[in-house]
Amino acid sequence: GVFMTTDRVNHFLFKDYEQDGEYQQEFFDFYRKVDEYLGKLRDQLADDVTMVVASDHGFTTLEYEVHFNEWLEQQGLLDFSTDDHSELGDISEDATAYSLIPGRFYINLDGREPNGGVSEDDYEEVRDDLKEKLESLEGPNGNKVADRVVTREDAFRGDHSDIAPDLVVVPNHGFDLKAGFKGSEDVFGVGPRNGMHSFDNATLMVDDAEARIQDADLYDITPTILDLMDHDYDRTEFNGSSLV
């Protein structure tokens, strides 16, 4: 089963939870209800069935939305062929790079992008320069936007890595990375949400006393479930390993 409401509640009430806000009690009441549902579900399972509860991300308080394409425009790195731009196809050949959510950056490479203008010979220098700019970008509060900026070679592997972004920004807590093409008045803004996804505090519970939880990774979930189901599989097909 999937509980989507946990995501929605955290987006709009996480700051209340973390900073003793107006709706902190309602936040706790919601999780008590989720816990109750999980308990009822576990009671209906046979004794030899292992229950696994996992989330694919954690949450953190959101302070600022970062409109990266607006930032690229202000840096002179993004240009559009029309003043009434609204989509990726409106980018001109004079553009150096563009961004897609969440924190994916593409060099406007000639021969790869529809209106590519950056040559293969200039690719590495252009990407290195953009990476340096992203690493030094600070928010209105003086905090660095990026926890780290990762190249495609380090971030992706597999049969389709050729379509991966050239750079990926992993944000510090407090920043939500945006990338629309209609334009924004400011690089940094505040929206209706006060909570945003984080990479480092996802939830994992395996109802097995011998399960290895320490240093677990999302990659470990699939082989764990396959082992619990006694399903044969080629262990070399997975990056993770079973926790049971």
Q: What is the predicted role of each segment?
A:
Residues 168-222, 230:
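Low-complexity, glycine/alanine/valine/leucine- and proline-rich hydrophobic stretches
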Residues 8-12, 18, 57, 192-198:
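Histidine-centered active-site/metal-ligand motif
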Residues 1-36, 40, 110-114:
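Active-site His/acidic residue clusters
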Residues 10-14, 62-66, 180:
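A short acidic (Asp/Glu
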Residues 32, 80-101, 116-128, 196-199, ...:
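A short beta-strand-to-alpha-helix junction
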Residues 4-8, 16, 58-60, 111-113, ...:
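Short, solvent-exposed loop/turn segments at secondary-structure junctions
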Residues 40-175:
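Secreted, luminal/periplasmic, and some membrane-associated catalytic domains
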Residues 15-19, 65-74, 184-186:
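Short secondary-structure boundary/capping segments
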